[in-house]
Structures are given as structure tokens and as C-alpha cells.
Amino acid sequence: MNWTAIVVETSTEAVDAVSYILTDTGATGVKIDDAADYQKLKPGKYGPYGEIVDPSTLPHREEGAAVTGYYPPTTFVPEKIADIRQRVAKLADFGLNPAPARVAAEEIDNQDWATAWQKYYHPVRVTRELTIVPQWEEYTPATADEKLLVLDPGMAFGTGTHPTTQLMLQALTIALRGGESMIDVGTGSGVLSIAAKQLGAGEVWAYDIDDVAVKSAKKNLALNPIAKDVHTGVNSLLDGIHTQVDLVVANILAEIILPLVPQAFENLKPGGKFLTSGIINTKFETVKKAIEAQGFVVDETMRIKDWYGIIAHKPAPEEA
């Protein structure tokens, strides 16, 4: 037997009351989709691990709210809907406007829970050479030069199509010539490490402060045989890392890039490149100045929408 989702279209001010009604009438879980919540989000807001939030990339309502309650198979739906409609209408007696107060129900196939979200993800060409492909998609490269980055978007840390990721993939395409060693800081899904291997990088290390991210990266790396030898580990930025590589890449936010800058400089060979993005436009000058103050030479800046990427290099002795 299948579960039932009962959806109440309502106003922002009535969301809490409607949620209570659904719970009180037997819903085992409630989901709130409120336009007001999306309006509060600002580009660059981030969580404890520097997750990037760009509201324009999130599916959302333009106005009002929808509160969905999930009811077990034993529920007598017609009676439940009538009860909910009556109780929602009475909210006006308590000074709340529940309009439009539409109530509808749909049956949920148990099998749909696991796979319904997959219909929103399709192969995306992110650079001339690189295409991101969801794990379940059958996809044939259009040209001999096209390289595939196979990801499982069902994991945490996104699909690789955010503007900052696109900037980093473009930067990798510019910077890599083949055989370079690289450290991927804040690897998340592992997409940059996979792309680097596809573009000819040599030895690659992928670090993240979050062990969930590292597990996600490992699974995605396993989906791409070319990246099977990428080293992974839990680490805070480059704390305790002392090596010499050709590239350090980081798609993290400005506040987190700043303490990374001296660590990146230390871990790069002379002439090595530092590629970074996750920089919202209001923080671009601050990050650029910090990179230059450390001794880097900024070679190129790139922009998509409100986000910036920077390609810089550590001067070789002959440049002094």
C-alpha cells in the first residue's frame, strides 16, 4: 500500500498553524515550501564547511507557501481532507489569513521515494571539453575530445553545475598541460579532482574538513576509473600538509580562502598555480589583494554572474 501526501496551499503567516494541523491529524512528517524563506537567502551564505548557496539555482516558490503532510497507508483520505479543510478555514477566527487554503492529496508510490528526484538531473556540458553526467544516465560523448565527469547528485555537495564549479573547471582547462601534481582543497563531490585527472593531471590529493564530503568524493571517484588513484583524506584546509605540488585548487568561499592563501603558497613549487573560486563579487577585491600580498602573481580573473575565479602563480626565481 502507498502513502498519501496532503498539500495545503496557504500564506506565510499561517505556515506554523497549518503544520500543526497536519501533524495533529496524523501526518508523520511535514515539509514546508515557503517563498519567504528563499527571499531571505543571499549569495555567499555558507554553512560550517563553506557550502555555497546561490538562491537562483534553487527551485522555489515565487509567492505564498505550501505545507505537505505525509500520511501512512492506513489513512482514510477523504475524511482527513475534510477535517483539514475545516480546521484551516477556522484559522481566520484566530487572526490568521490562510488563503488560498487549497487542500489536495496525491498518492505516493513507495518506489518513487528513491528515484523521483532523478528526473531533474541531466548531462550538462560545462566547458568545451567537460560534460557532467549523472550516474544513471546513458550518455555518449558528442566528440572525441569530450570528457565525462560521472557524478551521483543524490549525495551531498551538489551536482557540479554551480557557477563557481564551472569557473574552476574552466581554470583547470587553462592551467593543466599534463602530468601536474595537484591538491584539491575542500573537495566536496570530488568533481575537480575527477576533472583534473580527465585533463591529464598526475598525482592528486583531495581533502575536505567533513568526513561526509570525503565519503561522497570517494564514491564519485570510484565512478570514474581514471580517478581511481586520487588520494583522499579528512583535513582542515592544508593544516599539517607540507609538500610541493604544481597546482592547489579550492572552490570555497572568500572567508575560507583567506587563511588558505599562505598555506597554498607554501605548498606550491616555484611557478606553481593557485586556482580558486567561490568568491562573491563583494569579496573579490579583498581576496585578490590577499593573494597578491602573499607574493602570488594574478594571471587571470574570471566571472560568471556574481561569482569570481582567480588563476595565480607563485613566482619562479627567474622572475625575481
From Swiss-Prot:
One of its GO terms (cellular component) is cytoplasm. S-adenosyl-L-methionine binds at T165, G186, D208, N251. One of its GO terms (biological process) is methylation. Its main location: cytoplasm. It is an enzyme of class 2 (transferase). Disulfide bonds: none annotated. Keywords: Cytoplasm, Methyltransferase, S-adenosyl-L-methionine, Transferase. It comes from the Bacteria. InterPro entries: Ribosomal_L11_MeTrfase_PrmA, Ribosomal_PrmA_MeTrfase, SAM-dependent_MTases_sf. It is found in: Cytoplasm. Its EC number is 2.1.1.-. It catalyses: L-lysyl-[protein] + 3 S-adenosyl-L-methionine = N(6),N(6),N(6)-trimethyl-L-lysyl-[protein] + 3 S-adenosyl-L-homocysteine + 3 H(+). GO terms for molecular function: protein-lysine N-methyltransferase activity. Methylates ribosomal protein L11. Belongs to the methyltransferase superfamily. PrmA family. This is Ribosomal protein L11 methyltransferase. The gene is prmA.
